[in-house]
Amino acid sequence: ELLIKIILLPDCLINIITEFIPKIVFVFTNRDNYSLYHSLIKKYIYNYENYIRDTIRRDNEFVFEKIIEENYKRWYLIKNYKYKNLNFKNYLYFVLYYCVENDSNNCRNVLNYFCSQHGLCKNLYKKNVVQYIRWRN
């Protein structure tokens, strides 16, 4: 009922009200607002890496695309990333592995397209990117 009443307000009142609402509130209202304010999220998320993994698990390609655009240079520079008993050459290879592990085909396609557009990860299927780091006797 409250939302219906808010929608019925005139546009000039809605514009005045929205000036007093913090921008972080608008991030999750629709795609346009997410595109405008997605950079504000990083400050409010305690563990950003878990946010990235959760986005991949949910196969949310729109959010994942924005995350890649913000972080791909930093991900490429993170060397020897360790996850469970695996060692990856960089964080991008881990993200690709995690997409495959969780059957996140939309996120995987976004990552492959982004890498091909920026000239990253050429001949990705030929490279041995995972090393198992368990002790053997």
Where are these regions (language model features)?
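Ankyrin-repeat-protein effector appendages
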Residues: 113-137
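Conserved hydrophobic site in ankyrin repeats
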Residues: 67, 110-115
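Alpha-solenoid repeat scaffolds
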Residues: 24, 73-74, 102, 106-107, ...
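Cullin-RING E3 adaptor/co-adaptor recruitment helices
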Residues: 1-73, 80-100, 128-135
